[in-house]
Amino acid sequence: MRKAEQDSVAIDDQERDLVGVGMGWWHREVPQIDCSGKAVVGRILHLHDVILREVDRTLARHGLKYPAYAVMATLRVQGPPYAMPPKALLRTLILSSGGLSNLLRRMERDGQITRSSDDRDGRGVIVRLTEHGRAIVEPAMRDHADTERHLVRVLSAAEQRAMVQGLSRMMGRAQP
């Protein structure tokens, strides 16, 4: 391979693995700092951006953004009557309570959900997926699952299982 081709391959590899490049800088400039955690954490953070970009592209075809999709899909997979209290929704989503309240208000205005008092507890509220919301989210759920499978197809089944185990263990330790 000629020098120019080797340089081109090296640049392509660097662009694909920005974390590895950054770690090289750390090793060179601050070798006294153990930055080995960056090998995993940095790649998870980078993948977060890559995954969200792909998911957003998929959901945009359905006129959705991820937070509204996550609420509707979570309600849908509860089964009939496709309902949950906001506190239960909040525990399953990565949103603040204020963020969820604003999102639910917009979704109710758009006819995707309804909010009503909880029959079991007059003080509580129940969020329900509407037929309109269900008609939007069901095809989006299929496309979202396709996108997720597309994103992980570069990994063998064994690699996927190993990642699930390792990431689950990390997530368990990160819980407050």
Label the model's feature ranges.
Residues 105-165:
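Charged, amphipathic alpha-helical coiled-coil/dimerization segments
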Residues 86, 104-105:
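Short, hydrophobic-biased segments on the C-terminal half of alpha helices
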Residues 1-62:
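N-terminal leader segment of winged-helix/HTH proteins
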Residues 38-41, 45, 49, 94, ...:
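Short amphipathic alpha-helical segments with heptad-repeat character
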Residues 35, 45, 49, 53-96:
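N-terminal helix-turn-helix DNA-binding core of bacterial DNA-binding proteins
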